[in-house]
Amino acid sequence: MITMQRGPQPADFTDVRATNLAVVLRYVRSHYPCSRADIATATGLNKATVSSLVVDLIDRHLVREIGFTENRIGRPATMLTMDGSPYVAVGLEVNADHLGLVAVDLVGAQVLAWRRSFAGLESTPSQAAAAIAALSRRAVAKLVKDGRRVLGLTVGVPGLVDAKGTVKFAPNLGWQEVDLLETLGRALGEPDFPVTVDNDANLAVLAESRYGSHAGTENMIYLTGQIGIGAGIISDDRMIRGSRGFPGEIGHLTIDPGGALCGCGRRGCLEAVAGIGALIAKALPDSAYDGKLTDLQPEVDEVVQRAKAGDKVTLAALDDAGHALGNAVSIVANLLDPAVVVFGGYFVPLAPWLLPPAQQELAARSVAPQECAQIVASTLGYSATAVGGAAAVLDFIDAGNLPRP
């Protein structure tokens, strides 16, 4: 589960020190370089307490001193920055055609990024868990060899995931009521770091809000451009999770009631009209694509090449998909009033042709009297969900679950 914090607050309950360590760490992460006095002023903790907490964070290799600054009135202050050199957070994306893994340090810098083909629809949950575990073990072994310590792993899945890590329904993987967290725990052999499971779009929008081109935007929607289309939503700087943890299923809004059959069993869903599989089938009518391929990158590359060459069939398919996406986005935008809508996944290389009709459709259907939301392509590309998984681990640390010295 992801909890988005508005900012650090001093603790007034049981484990005061552990919580206040997290308060100081979060402040340094957001404001480095900073001084102990800066921390005390911002958090309300007294200077002696801050000094003691900083010593503890330095001992844990989470924070380090970087010298003095004289750009202030009074005595020069010793400045602090993030350390975290021994630590990494790992995120992993499960999709119908690939697995993606990213490891980041405490400031979000990537230290490892892998992508592997994966036949998701042809794999049983146990086989998928084994593949996830194998990739995770390889990554952990490399990171440990490089002197790193893994703080946690968050796995993103394209489907409905409850708070216990059970995948309730993932049509593009053929899963229903799969206790992935337990299955993965067995496959990993009870690792010495926490493992969690979440929805892919939720993790992707978290990544965009932290590291994307519009980082810090308080009202944002992210659309996964994979085999399926999901939406991660941040409203007023908080992630929307709904009553059961299943919001954002924009891919199953009905766009064409008499349209193609969707993987969910209904007809005319956005996924069936403008998902990457439907788009490829329309844009490349002469291709061998049969909806069962496990790596769509060659087909996406071919769509890009034909679009650049001005192929009329390809351009028409992209235009239709863009308008359908804009239509669906307008429904959500009229409800939530986002500032930015981010298209991710396979939609990124297709953005030059998808964004203009999508923006046009959104503008035409928006009821807001002023300029509507801006639709942009993700700068995180295919790795947004995995990056968001790593960010979720960092949030877990920021909540007070600090590594032991």
Language model features with spans:
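Short glycine-rich anion-binding loops that position phosphate/pyrophosphate groups of nucleotides
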Residues: 69, 158-160, 226-228, 347-348
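Glycine-rich phosphate-binding loop of actin/hexokinase-like ATP-binding domains
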Residues: 215-274
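Short coil/turn connectors at secondary-structure junctions
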Residues: 85-87, 191-193, 215-220, 229, ...
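ATP-binding/phosphotransfer module of carbohydrate and carboxylate kinases, centering on a glycine-rich
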Residues: 1-68, 72-76, 81-117, 121-149, ...
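General beta-strand structural signal in soluble alpha/beta enzymes
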Residues: 65-66, 194-199, 233
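Glycine-rich phosphate-binding loop and adjoining helix at the ATP-binding site
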Residues: 110, 115-219, 353-364
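Short, acidic, Ser/Thr-enriched surface-loop or helix-capping motifs
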Residues: 105-106, 162, 234
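Short, glycine/acidic-enriched loop or turn micro-motifs at the edges of active sites
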Residues: 96, 203, 227
